[in-house]
From Swiss-Prot:
Homotetramer. It comes from Salinibacter ruber (strain DSM 13855 / M31). This is Tryptophanase. The keyword Lyase applies. Belongs to the beta-eliminating lyase family. Its EC number is 4.1.99.1. The modification N6-(pyridoxal phosphate)lysine is found at K256. The keyword Lyase applies.
Amino acid sequence: MDTIIEPFRIKSVEPIQLTSRAERERMIRDAHYNLFNLHADDVIIDLLTDSGTSAMSAAQWAGLMQGDESYAGSPSYFRFEEAVKDLMPFEHVIPTHQGRAAERILMGIVAGPDAKIPSNTHFDTTRANIEATGAEAVDLVIDAGHVPDAEHPFKGNINLDRLEALLDAEGDRVPIVMLTVTNNTGGGQPVSLANIRGAKALCDTYDVPLVLDACRFAENAYFIKQREDGYGDRSVKEIVREMFSHADGMTMSAKKDALVNIGGWLALDDDAWARKARNQLILTEGFPTYGGLAGRDLEAIAVGLQEIVDEDYLEYRMASTRYLGEALTELGVPIVKPVGGHAVYIDAKSLLPHIPPLDYPAQSLAVALYVTGGIRGVEIGSVMFGRQPDGSEEPADQELLRLAIPRRVYTQSHVDYVIECFEALVGRKGALCGYEITEEPPQLRHFTAHLRPKAPEAVHHETDGPVEASS
């Protein structure tokens, strides 16, 4: 059947506050044209991130009531640990309050000045945590990963030839190799098991550990089942286990593929690294059996890890994301292809060729989409990645607007509304203007930077979009 049916019933709802275009123009101006600065209740459809925005299941809510809040040795920790090891058989599982804390602890152990840490593509917090130690983050995605409309089943793969060349030339400077699954910066693109095995073989040759940044591990496994020869008859759970069998460690934000609102972990096989990690954890996060999380959160993660490998859920998840991508393509909106698992990525460089990269075309599109219909996405381009460690500015590899779809939150009609807003926006894309940054922090500037349009009338004179309602 053609209808995409959500494989769940809705038990609890939250009202959406509708706003007029005039209100949204005022609110985005007050937010200094940075969508991170908006109040969430002034957003109609929030596609800023899929991180921590999932709707939890009835079973997860029930799990909250079982949470044991003992400071040390909580049974909730041991249920959490068992759930992690059921999918990811690492020796040591160290909880953290979210993924970037796991990254910070790991980089504090392995990185430092003169180190290089390669990956297919590092996402923003990983890169920042690497650079905070004085190390260099190196991106080695395959060539197809740089071309938004290139059709490749595993565009998230790391370039094994370039990885081997780096390890051969500078292996003494490489403490770990990372793989981000799926590759968020590159469009939510998956990494094949063949590529994971190939990376592990190189790591073994040069005696370098392989660590997976595994926030969307289940989506990656589902893509493997659908696209990689020999895995069509394997269960997602089996594929997940095989993925992690080739790694020496992992960082994880539970706010993605553990279907919860907070949490993460660092998992390792190396005993010495684990001892150092737990010492750092006690210093900044908490005792090793809670790691900055309440026992109830550990319980919710344990349940979420069972639910995320349900193949009916994953089929719905991929189909709904694909539906949005295909509809935008029909409207003539260029997107990263094939459609990723957690988000649709708009190629703003192609859609708005009149706006130079350092005038931030994806940010321009993000602001216009919010003003048009109250939809919040996020720029993944030169605002996020253009600032270099020495303070200079260079265009990012791609200028993308990410529409990240929260798990189990929106229905098909919400997605149809997003499509309708794009239809209204595409007809006046030529009127959109570039932006400039007026205030920024030294790191991760996209979260708090202030911007302004180079032609304010392009933002504030258009007619109303699809929604015109008073709050």
